[in-house]
Every structure is written in C-alpha cells, then in structure tokens.
Amino acid sequence: MENISNKPLSAIISEVADRYWQRINDVFPELANELTKEQGEELYRIMGLSDFIADQLCRHPQWILSLFNGELNNLSRSEFDKDLHGLLSECQSEDEANRVLRCYRNKQMVRLAWRDFLGYASLENSLLDLSALAEALIISARDWLYIQACKQYGTPMDSEGNPQPLIILGMGKLGGRELNFSSDIDLIFTFPEHGETQGGRRAIENQQFFIRMGQRLVNMLHQVTVDGFVYRVDMRLRPYGESGPLVVSFSGLEDYYQEQGRDWERYAMVKARALGPWTAFSDELHSMLRPFVYRRYIDFSAIESLRKMKQLITQEVRRRQLTDNIKLGAGGIREVEFVVQSFQLIRGGREPSLRQQSLFAAIDTLYQLGQLEYLAVDELKQSYLLLRRVENLLQGIGDQQTQTLPDSGLNWYRLCHCMGMASEAELRTHIESAMSKIHRHFIETVGGRTQDEGADLWTQQLWIAYEDDDAQTLIKEQMIDDPELWPQLKSWRETVANRSIGPRGRDTLDKLMPWLLREFTNLPTPSDALNSVSKVIDQILTRTTYLELLYENPGARQQLVSLCCASPWIAAQLAKFPMLLDELIDPTQLYDTTSLDDYGSELRQYLLRVPEEDMEQQMEALRQFKLSQQLKIAAADVTGVLPVSQVSDHLTLLSEAIIEQVVMQAWQQVTARHGVPAYLEEGVTGFAVIGYGKAGGIELGYGSDLDLVFLHSFSREKYPDQGETDGDRPIEVGHFYLKLAQRILHLFSTRTTSGELYEVDMRLRPSGASGLLVSEIEYFGEYQREEAWTWEHQALVRARFMFGSNGLSSRFSELRSEVLQLARDGSDLAKAVRDMRTKMRDHLLKVKTGHFDLKQSAGGIADIEFIAQYLVLANANQHNELSFWSDNIRIFTGLGELGILAHADVESLIQAYLFLRDESHRQTLQQKPGELPLDLVAEHANRVMDIYQRILVD
C-alpha cells in the first residue's frame, strides 16, 4: 500500500482543507502549538481528503492528539472488544449505552479511515479492522442488553436449567471479515433451545425473551441519535423475511432451511458466521447449517442459480439506471463473489477446505485445489482489491453507503490522490480494465450468451434499403404478401432518424432491427407486428441498455413480438414500463406463474434487493413487482398456459401480498415516529384491511382498483389507561390509526416512475366519504346493524378479510355473519335491491345499439351479482352457511346445495358469470371497451334476465 503522506495536494482538495483547517482552529485555537509541523501537515491533508474525518474532528478536536500519540500507528483488534465491554459496564441506562457505542464507533472509524486514506494499512487489514470493530460493537451491545433483559424478565433456560444465549449470525461481508467502510450489516438472530425464563417476576418463553431483546438490540445499533448511528441493520435475511419472527430457535432454523430454503439463501449462508467468542453453540449451529449450504455431491445446479441471481442484479442495475456502479455492474465486485462462491457451492460438499467465509482465503484454496489457474487467481484478486479499495475510499469520504463512481470533480481528485493516479482518465482506465477482466472470468465460470452480428440476414438489407424498388424486390423474393410492410417500416425509420439517440444507441438499433424484422416476417401480417412492437422500441430508443437486452437475447425478442401481437394491453405495458423487458429473457420463467401461496414470499425476496431505509426505492420496488407479476399472469393468460378461470385468483392473491407489505411499511414509518399503541401485544398491529367488490370476491381483473375498508381493534372502554402510543412523540391511539391509514393510502397512490401501485376506493366505509378513514371494529358492527342501507349489506356479502391478526379476522367474520343473518322482509328486500340495480343501470349504462355492456346491460355481470346478494340476504337467517363465502361461484353452489336455487339455474348463472368475466379479461387485454355485439352474448344474457325476473321481480 502506497504511503501518500508526502504527495502534494491538488488545488481543489487544498481549498476544502483550508475551510476545515479554519473551522477546527476556531474550536481548538491552541491546536497549532500542540502539533509538530509534520503532524499539522498530515491533519491538513486528511481533512482535505475526507469530509467525514474532518467533520468528526471538528466536533471532537480532543481526538486529534490521542490519534497522533500512537493510535494511528498501533492498532490491535482485540482492543475493540475489551474497550467496549469496559465502557458499557459503567452504563446505567440505554441512553448512556447508545452514547458510548456511537462515540466509540465514530472515533474508531475516523482512526481506520485515516489509516486507509493515507496508506498506513493494506486493504486486507483495513477490511479486517472494520469487521472486527463491527463485531465488537454488536457483541458488546448484545452482552450489555442480555444482562439488562435478564434483570427484567429472568434468565432464559433450556429444559435442563442451562442458560440460553442469543447467537448472532453475521452475514455477507461481515461474516467474511471483509466489511467495507460504510456498510449495512446483515444479521440473523437465533438461540439454541426453547424453554422459559427463570428468576423474573413472571416466566416468559425463551423466544419472547429474545425477540424483545433483539428488538432493543436492532434499535441500539440502527437508531439515529444526536451522536449518529452505529450501523444500519438489515434483518431481512432471516427465515420468512420481515413476516417471520425476529428470532428463531436452532430447530426452527433447521426446519426452515430443510423444507423451504431457497438457492439465494444457500448463497447467503456461504458467508454466515456466528459472531463473538467461539463456543460449543457456535459449532452446533454451523454443523446444523452445513448440509443445507454444501451438498454431499458435486452440485452443478449452483451455476444456474447464480446465473439467475446475476440476471436479477443486472435487471436491478437497468431498472434503477445505475451507471458507474463498481459493485453491481458488469465486472463489478459482486461478480468476483459469484465466481468464487459458485466453486464453493459446487465443490464445498466434497472439499471441506472450501467451506470458509473469507473470499481471499477461498480464492487461494481454489488455486491450491487446481480449480483456478494462477493467472485467473491473480487477475481476480488484483482486480477485486482495486475495486474494494476504490469502494472503501468512496464510502470514507462522507460515511455514505455508495458504490457509484463520483459525479463531482472534487471526489475524483480525492480518489486519484489516494490511489496514486494522475487523473480521472487514468483511474477510470484501471477500473475499466479490472472490471473487464472480472467479467471475462465471470462469463467463463457462470456463462453468458453471444450473438452473431446478423450481417447475412436479408432483413439487414431491408433495414438499410432506401430505394422503394429495392425494398419491394427484397420483400417479394421472400414471398411476403403485405403491401403495408415497407411503407410502414420506411415511415417509422424516418421518424427514428430524427430522434437523438447517440452513437452507441444507433449502432445497437442497427444491429437489433434485422433480427426483429426476421421475427416479423415469419408472421402472416408482418406490418401488424411492426406497428405493435415499434411502439415499444420508440420508448427505449434513448435507453440503450434495453436495446442491447433485446439484441443479446433471442428469447426476449421472440417473446416481445409474440406478446405484442397477442395483446395490445401487454404491448402498452411494455412501452410504458420498459423495465418489464427483463421478464422476457427467460421464457420458462415468464410463463411459470407464481403459485397462489407464494406471492407473499416472492415479494419479500424481491424487496431484499432494496435498502430497507430507502422508502422511495421500496415504493418503486413494490410497483415493479406488481407490474412484472401482472405481466407473467397476462402472458400465461394470452398463450393459454394459465386457465382463464384462474386469472382473477392470481391477480387477487398478488394484491393481498402487496397490501401486506404496504401496511407493514406504513406501520414501520408511523411507529418510528410515534411508537406502538400501548394496548397491543407484541408483534400485533391491531389493524385490519377488508376487501370489498372484486377484491373481496377474489375476482380482480387487469387494472382493477381496490375497494377497501380499514378497521382497528382499540376501544377506549376496554383499554382506558392505554390510549396513547409508547414512543418519544406519543399520540392518541385513534389518531395513530388515522395516520397509519393516511400513510397506507399515500404508499398506494403515489405516482413513481413505475406508476401508481393501485387506485384505492374507500367509499364503502361506514358513512362513506364523510366517515372516518379507519373505524373501530365494534363501531363497524354497530353501524352495519343499525345504520347501514340495504346496498351496504349487499356490499358486505362481497367483503373479505385481507390483512390483520387472527383475532381481528375472527371478530370481523362474526360481525359480518351477524349482519348478513339478520331477518329481513323478502318483498321489501327485493324492492330495495331492484331499485338499486335500476338506479345503477340508469347511471352507468352507456352502450351503442346492438352491443352489450358486459357489466351493466340487463343480463350482465351486475345482474348476476345482485341475484347472489339478494339470495344471501334473504336466506342467511335460515341458512347460516350462506354468510361464509364472498365469491359468487361458491355462493351459487351453496344455494344449489340448499335447494334455494334450482340446479339448472345454478349452472346457467355460473356459466354466464364465467363467460362474461372471461370476455371482460379478453377485452382488457385487447384494449377494447367492455362490450360485445349483442348476438354473441344473447344466449347467456337471456337466461340471466329470466332468472332475475323470477327471483327479484315476479
């Protein structure tokens, strides 16, 4: 490592150093007299190189002398643990402990950054130092909190009376002792055995003890105070992610990974390491996890898993438009990790020496085992070291988590100074060379695709043709009978020529279009395909990465053409949201719709790619997940892979997964500010989301909005002394739930680059638009019994519990059943339902003569729904089971089984309902209004009208 303490500073760095020098002399006037000339020059230099160091020293000028008096040169990692345990042992409160941890962290980070910037330590040692500091801070905080928690709850014991510890798995670079300067820390909390606490006022289960302790530990590390934070903590790698318990037992971990562990979790577990002093429990935990991570056989399936993970990262880079990213870009830090870990996962089951968390150690072992040649090892290591050094310096400038090369001249000068480079151009050349070498080895190991230029295609000649006769001759030679193809292509090409694309984009377009034209000319009417696909290409002309994606992936091109021709709605989605093109790369995945039970877990995994604290990116990720899953459903729908009868099931279950995440994100934001309502038990929100309409009836379509009602479980009569939240800014519980509801609606409705998440309609809540945004559940029941109109009871037939605790779910079901089972006069009910249907038809039916509105015309979907609602309200008092289902199909089936509806009528209504809903989906996918020629639906409509007349009119 080059020592740069005597290298002259550039003018732009000196200008920054001057400002900090003045500032520090203002707060420490006698400093100049305390330092030698060499020390003064070194201090001046380091303040010009790092804003973080300079800012911390201006706040804590007393650190300067202690750093010069040996701390910069003499560093023993074992001191971290000893110092922290000593300092924390004197703390009497959590506030004191927070202050100690943050001040110690900041001083040591200044010390380590100083050594790094001036070349006093090699990169390997810097990473070891940073990892040791993080481990000491985490473990000392854990140990201090364990003592406090034992005083409060008693000591957790196993069945034989042995104390149980909290074991913390450090994941990622922390586990590998390769932590960068400003990094999140990924942790998993676990404990050996279930049992109860002993010695407290009352016994609680071990898991409850560790969950409470774990929550305090995360806050102690993560929370931002006046002294800053210790580390940003990410707990989402634990089993079941955010929806899983914060802490699980060893047996819980083992069961999860054996039964549900995914490939990406195997990859993550390669670097997992039990933090703190090694114990028998550490051995037990690692032995238990080993069979999941390392298979007994040589496991080449790991290659495909890593390839898919890399594909996801590449998509993320495109979607977030990350340029100059030395971690995630092609040839970045992550690709080195993939190369090494692919060998570890493939051969680690047979080669115990590969089972190690450190990348540096693993890559040396691969050379010793003959798995990598010396040149590959040398290139990978040197390139990796360069990128990690740049990453560390980038983050040390402002203590910010970034892997993106600077967009300011100042930070380039700082990087060049520390890296011993004369200019940005020289450093960029070294970085690009390193990334090129890494990417080459990545492709050789994990695989990739190549493609010919396509110069021999006849469509190449068509794309560059200028004379009409030449183009028409080419088309005739191929026996293509489509007079619109050339005029349309020529016109579109002229439009494109006037667009500002840039040389790289234009070159890629010129390579792509012959291949697309070949796809078009294999179809009966190529001009139709060109018309549809060109609208997508128009939207990505200035997004060269997407043009390259289509050029490099034949499968993506084929799917683009196929889907755009099959559905204008899909074409419009692809044009509006180009990031969806990533979904076309792998046709097997595109048409493999997520199973109905897996939308929640898939979404949790998807959100792991986004920093937990970055709410803007979290909102964007939710929208992108919805769009990509919706595309998969539509693709499977139009190609017949997914039966039409299941489309609504998938769209509805997708919405449920998103609702859960939106509520939990809103919950985290509101509780971070105000705390949790004091009346709640641990891990419960006391909040429920009720779906009405299509959401309640499990009948969502493409582009459907959500009819929702929000409820909460708080009651002032039941909890008279717990009417506020428990945070630093407590508010009344009713106000808390109002803020939560407002935040949820904000997360749904905010329009990002990926659009709106869902349009949410809250007008079905008690008292409609004039009512409270969120109601207490008992008031909801009272309103439904005493104030609601008949049409509100009709709506309640379609209501379904979509999010909340089991207790709230049970209570809602009871209240709903009570209301639906109220005794009603049959003729009065029929008149009220009939009048509402007439009013709705008069207001909403606008269809031209000879056409049939699928929903509002007589004999349409609305008539069928009103028949179901009337029959439930009229008969549930005598047949309680009718109040169970919210979807029309099962309601009609139940009515038939009870003999209330004739089986022929049941069959007619179900067939008509499915037919009309299917046609509604079809019309949406074709971007046509929800109507058909009357003769196509007359048979179904006439049967429905006949049944409607017999039941509601005669």
Curated annotation (Swiss-Prot):
<dbReference type="GO" id="GO:0008882">
    <property type="term" value="F:[glutamate-ammonia-ligase] adenylyltransferase activity"/>
</dbReference>
<comment type="function">
    <text>Involved in the regulation of glutamine synthetase GlnA, a key enzyme in the process to assimilate ammonia. When cellular nitrogen levels are high, the C-terminal adenylyl transferase (AT) inactivates GlnA by covalent transfer of an adenylyl group from ATP to specific tyrosine residue of GlnA, thus reducing its activity. Conversely, when nitrogen levels are low, the N-terminal adenylyl removase (AR) activates GlnA by removing the adenylyl group by phosphorolysis, increasing its activity.</text>
</comment>
<keyword id="KW-0547">Nucleotide-binding</keyword>
<dbReference type="GO" id="GO:0000820">
    <property type="term" value="P:regulation of glutamine family amino acid metabolic process"/>
</dbReference>
<protein>
    <recommendedName>
        <fullName>Bifunctional glutamine synthetase adenylyltransferase/adenylyl-removing enzyme</fullName>
        <ecNumber>2.7.7.89</ecNumber>
        <ecNumber>2.7.7.42</ecNumber>
    </recommendedName>
</protein>
<comment type="similarity">
    <text>Belongs to the GlnE family.</text>
</comment>
<dbReference type="InterPro" id="IPR013546">
    <property type="entry name" value="PII_UdlTrfase/GS_AdlTrfase"/>
</dbReference>
<keyword id="KW-0511">Multifunctional enzyme</keyword>
<dbReference type="GO" id="GO:0047388">
    <property type="term" value="F:[glutamine synthetase]-adenylyl-L-tyrosine phosphorylase activity"/>
</dbReference>
<keyword id="KW-0808">Transferase</keyword>
<keyword id="KW-0067">ATP-binding</keyword>
<dbReference type="InterPro" id="IPR043519">
    <property type="entry name" value="NT_sf"/>
</dbReference>
<keyword id="KW-0548">Nucleotidyltransferase</keyword>
<dbReference type="GO" id="GO:0005524">
    <property type="term" value="F:ATP binding"/>
</dbReference>
<feature type="region of interest" description="Adenylyl transferase">
    <location>
        <begin position="454"/>
        <end position="954"/>
    </location>
</feature>
<dbReference type="InterPro" id="IPR005190">
    <property type="entry name" value="GlnE_rpt_dom"/>
</dbReference>
<dbReference type="GO" id="GO:0005829">
    <property type="term" value="C:cytosol"/>
</dbReference>
<dbReference type="InterPro" id="IPR023057">
    <property type="entry name" value="GlnE"/>
</dbReference>
<dbReference type="GO" id="GO:0000287">
    <property type="term" value="F:magnesium ion binding"/>
</dbReference>
<dbReference type="Pfam" id="PF08335">
    <property type="entry name" value="GlnD_UR_UTase"/>
</dbReference>
<keyword id="KW-0460">Magnesium</keyword>
<feature type="region of interest" description="Adenylyl removase">
    <location>
        <begin position="1"/>
        <end position="450"/>
    </location>
</feature>
<dbReference type="Pfam" id="PF03710">
    <property type="entry name" value="GlnE"/>
</dbReference>
